């Protein structure tokens, strides 16, 4: 199920809150979580949660949907190539989606997947969440997280708000793929507890 197939209202919500064109990309500065100050515990619990983010969005909302923005062959960003365990692989696909809670985009996700792995394992992925495949296959090994801060304007959102994201590497045999996720303004990750006034010490 995709958000844009549900009804016209949801499409209007997308145009207001997410107005970027595929491929959006994430040419940002990634850091270890220990090198930044995460503003509050609620955000920390989303950023560093090692479980399935898809399942967390599903459990935190009454209506869940996945919007496939696009998937195509693309040269990864330099910061993506430096993370990938390149083993003779020269062709990758970029896949970008929105995870939607209650008819609103909560998470932007970008995955960089070796073409050979797409051909052998993921050729029929379509609208299915990639996380469903990854977390149901015990063969995958996940790396530690890196985090980033990115302006909401990169996603066509008319706001000066700073958004937080994370990425990790999933490895299976000789294949390595990047899964990066940015929490959009409507995501519950930003609903900090009352009385919390801890501010990030890091800037974009």
Task: Annotate each PLM feature.
Residues 3-204:
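Composition-driven recognition of glycine/serine/threonine/acidic- and proline-rich low-complexity segments
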